[in-house]
């Protein structure tokens, strides 16, 4: 598992992607709940 030199670790990609997805979904639902969903 340590042979990831020169490449981005898969767990790092998964973590970043998960945070981005959760953040975008959270912002979208928060905007919709606040009445700003139509502007997204």
Swiss-Prot record:
* Keyword Transmembrane tagged: yes
List the InterPro entries hit by this protein, alphabetically.
PSII_PsbJ, PSII_PsbJ_sf
Q: Which UniProt keywords apply?
A: Chloroplast, Membrane, Photosynthesis, Photosystem II, Plastid, Reaction center, Thylakoid, Transmembrane, Transmembrane helix
Subcellular localization, as worded in the UniProt entry: Plastid, Chloroplast thylakoid membrane
Name the Pfam families on file.
PsbJ
Q: What main location does UniProt list?
A: plastid
**GO terms classed as biological process:** photosynthesis
Note the topology in the membrane.
Answer: Single-pass membrane protein
Give TM segment ranges.
Answer: 10-30
Could you name the Gene Ontology cellular component terms for this entry?
chloroplast thylakoid membrane; photosystem II reaction center
Q: How does it assemble?
A: PSII is composed of 1 copy each of membrane proteins PsbA, PsbB, PsbC, PsbD, PsbE, PsbF, PsbH, PsbI, PsbJ, PsbK, PsbL, PsbM, PsbT, PsbX, PsbY, PsbZ, Psb30/Ycf12, at least 3 peripheral proteins of the oxygen-evolving complex and a large number of cofactors. It forms dimeric complexes.
Q: Provide the function of this protein.
A: One of the components of the core complex of photosystem II (PSII). PSII is a light-driven water:plastoquinone oxidoreductase that uses light energy to abstract electrons from H(2)O, generating O(2) and a proton gradient subsequently used for ATP formation. It consists of a core antenna complex that captures photons, and an electron transfer chain that converts photonic excitation into a charge separation.
Q: Which NCBIfam families match?
A: PRK02565.1 (NF002722)
User: What family is this?
Assistant: Belongs to the PsbJ family.
**How is this protein named in the record?**
Photosystem II reaction center protein J
Q: Which organism is it from?
A: Marchantia polymorpha
Gene name linked to the record: psbJ
